[in-house]
């Protein structure tokens, strides 16, 4: 299918406020014309009457770099209308460095890209270099600040990855080993961004009690680069910090007026999801191998269990994603404390995943309404049909929910802008995110009235309704009349 017409759709180009009735002609992977009543011989016709025709959605914050190899169909994203994912956030980008597990092995970013090409994922890929893996490639898991020589080595590696097409630099300063980095280290690495249009993105050092100081640090790091900052999953964690949103936005507004280019992404949920180790208070939050520590002695287990009484998180409402139950529910079933269940889970698995109820509905809507906030799932691709593959519902529900929340305030066209041209502009993704002549034909056809999430923590983590068809690089990737047949036409998009 190299030539086709999408007929009689309500075309929203992703950048303007207008939605117009028109046809879209696609040939050889690119948009050739957008106009009423296009005629072309020997052309397949797709009827889009009463449907929105929009640019394929761009997931501004994704973590699918490894799952694309094991699960290239990527149904959780393609069936939401996502055609491009920006991976490598929160300092996590093992694809950019030597990697070896039971399934895959590569020695460089170039080897990973060759493997990705062989796997043929359904979505396009843009990659960011993650600080945690960059640091680990030079320093291992060393729990200390970097030396001058180590910083120079990280700078050299980072520069090479930018030259290979990486879109920027990400950090996750609450995670290992990034949490051991000081601001000086981060600024030195970010300085390699100078002279490029590439961005610094961050899961900042604190999203709760020390939020405002953490934002100051992030802005200082961005300023040491090229003055561009993407605030990852912008939020205010824990009820005691919800009131800080206005002060946070004032800081951002002030920095923007001084010339910094600040944008953000957000998923439309008040539950976050990350490792269960995030419940650990000091000093145990510095121990990357907490599982081994707990296995060493009963004394260690009691010490951690007692410390968990001072956890910064609400343990009883914390959902263990692999069990699809809260710590409180599991504690009641076992007639023990939530702290005891949490300690046992940490002992069993350093990588236990959890979801935390810590955010405000009102703040969520206010953040999504900001003109510079793009849709970002913070999710991985998932099979969903695997009973052991539990994920946060944002993996399958972000885009329909974000669309509904954004459209409620600013209308359909602006909601689509935040899911298409805005993330394309943030990451400097060329010739995508807008329906325009000669641009790549990444296109979604959907029913705006019935575009709804069906994902939840209750086991109903299902695909959304309302998506009719998705095209990636001018080829059909998803058709709702044949949902099992996923076209795998995604490509790596280097950012120059």
Region locations from a protein language model:
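Metal-associated gating/positioning segment near the N- to mid-region
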Residues: 48-107, 111
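C-terminal cap of metal-dependent C-N hydrolases
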Residues: 292-297, 366-372, 377-380, 390-393, ...
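Active-site neighborhoods of metal-dependent hydrolases
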Residues: 116, 122-133, 137-148, 154-175, ...
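Divalent metal-coordination and catalytic microenvironments
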Residues: 9, 24, 29, 50, ...
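Acidic, glycine-enriched loop/beta-strand segments at the rims
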Residues: 12-23, 328, 353-364, 412-416, ...
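Histidine-rich, glycine-flanked metal-binding segment
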Residues: 1-5, 10-56, 71, 453
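Extended hydrophobic/aromatic segments used for targeting, binding, or gating
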Residues: 184-191, 199-226, 362-418, 423-425, ...
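Hydrophobic, small-residue-rich alpha-helical packing segments that form membrane-like cores
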Residues: 90-97, 101-224
């Amino acid at each position: 299918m190299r030539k086709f017409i999408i007929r009689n759709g309500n075309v929203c180009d992703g950048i303007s406020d207008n939605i117009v009735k028109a046809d879209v002609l696609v040939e050889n992977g690119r948009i050739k014309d957008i106009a009423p009543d296009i005629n072309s011989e020997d052309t397949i016709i797709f009827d889009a009457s009463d449907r929105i025709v929009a640019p394929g959605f761009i997931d501004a914050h994704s973590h699918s770099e490894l799952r694309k190899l094991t699960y290239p169909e990527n149904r959780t994203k393609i069936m939401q209308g996502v055609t491009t994912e920006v991976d490598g956030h929160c300092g996590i980008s093992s694809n950019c460095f030597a990697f070896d597990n039971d399934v895959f092995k590569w020695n460089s970013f170039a080897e990973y890209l060759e493997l990705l090409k062989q796997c043929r994922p359904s979505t396009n890929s843009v990659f960011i270099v993650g600080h945690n893996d960059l640091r680990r490639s030079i320093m291992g898991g060393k729990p200390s600040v970097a030396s001058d020589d180590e910083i120079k080595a990280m700078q050299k590696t980072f520069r090479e990855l930018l030259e290979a097409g990486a879109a920027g630099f990400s950090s996750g300063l609450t995670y290992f080993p990034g949490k051991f980095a000081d601001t000086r280290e981060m600024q030195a690495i970010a300085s390699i961004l100078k002279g490029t249009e590439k961005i610094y993105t961050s899961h900042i050092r604190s999203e709760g009690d020390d939020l405002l100081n953490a934002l100051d640090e992030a802005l200082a790091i961005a300023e040491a680069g090229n003055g561009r900052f993407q605030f990852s999953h912008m939020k205010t964690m824990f009820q005691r910090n919800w009131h800080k949103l206005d002060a946070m936005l004032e800081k951002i507004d002030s920095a923007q007026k001084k010339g910094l280019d600040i944008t953000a992404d957000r998923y439309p949920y008040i539950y976050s999801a990350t490792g269960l180790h995030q419940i650990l208070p000091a000093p145990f939050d510095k121990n990357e191998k907490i599982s081994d520590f707990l296995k060493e002695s009963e004394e260690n287990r009691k010490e951690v269990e007692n410390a968990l009484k001072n956890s910064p998180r609400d343990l009883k409402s914390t959902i263990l994603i692999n069990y699809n139950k809260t710590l409180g529910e599991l504690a009641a079933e076992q007639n023990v404390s939530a702290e005891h269940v949490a300690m046992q889970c940490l002992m069993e698995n350093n990588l236990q995943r959890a979801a935390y109820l810590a955010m405000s509905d009102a703040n969520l809507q206010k953040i999504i309404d900001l003109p510079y906030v793009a849709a970002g799932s913070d999710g991985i691709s998932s099979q969903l049909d695997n009973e052991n593959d539990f994920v946060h519902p944002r993996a399958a529900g972000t885009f329909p929910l974000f669309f509904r929340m954004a459209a409620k305030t600013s209308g359909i066209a602006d909601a689509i802008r935040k899911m298409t041209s805005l993330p394309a502009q943030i990451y400097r993704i060329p010739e995508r995110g807008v329906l325009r002549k000669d641009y790549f034909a990444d296109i979604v056809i959907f029913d705006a009235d019935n575009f709804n999430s069906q994902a939840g923590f209750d086991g109903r983590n299902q695909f959304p309704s309302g998506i009719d068809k998705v095209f990636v690089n001018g080829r059909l990737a998803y058709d709702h009349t044949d949902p099992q047949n996923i076209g795998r036409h995604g490509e790596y998009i280097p950012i120059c």
